[in-house]
């Protein structure tokens, strides 16, 4: 009985460590994307909200700046 409980506790600890590592990697991957907005959403170059990757903030109709797709120019 002790062996079974020990194995269950050990597997729970291993699972918790694996989950913590996965979560940490995921947070690092998308850390820069938090608080960003997508296409045709209102943005600000100088403050938040800023555009997500692949978009840029254009203020053609100031003060309503919006995110547009970055064509790679």
Curated annotation (Swiss-Prot):
GO terms for molecular function: sodium channel regulator activity; toxin activity. Expressed by the venom gland. GO terms for cellular component: extracellular region; host cell presynaptic membrane. Keywords: Amidation, Disulfide bond, Ion channel impairing toxin, Knottin, Neurotoxin, Presynaptic neurotoxin, Secreted, Signal, Toxin, Voltage-gated sodium channel impairing toxin. The modification Serine amide is found at residue 71. Residues 21-34 form a propeptide. Residues 1-20 form the signal peptide. Its main location: secreted. PROSITE patterns: MU_AGATOXIN (PS60015). It is found in: Secreted. Pfam families: Toxin_7. InterPro entries: Beta/delta-agatoxin_fam. Disulfide bonds join 36-52, 43-57, 51-67, 59-65. SUPFAM superfamilies: omega toxin-like. Belongs to the neurotoxin 07 (Beta/delta-agtx) family. 03 (aga-4) subfamily. Aga sub-subfamily. Insecticidal neurotoxin that induces an irreversible spastic paralysis when injected into insects. Modifies presynaptic voltage-gated sodium channels (Nav), causing them to open at the normal resting potential of the nerve. This leads to spontaneous release of neurotransmitter and repetitive action potentials in motor neurons. The presence of a 'disulfide through disulfide knot' structurally defines this protein as a knottin. This is U3-agatoxin-Ao1j. It comes from Agelena orientalis.
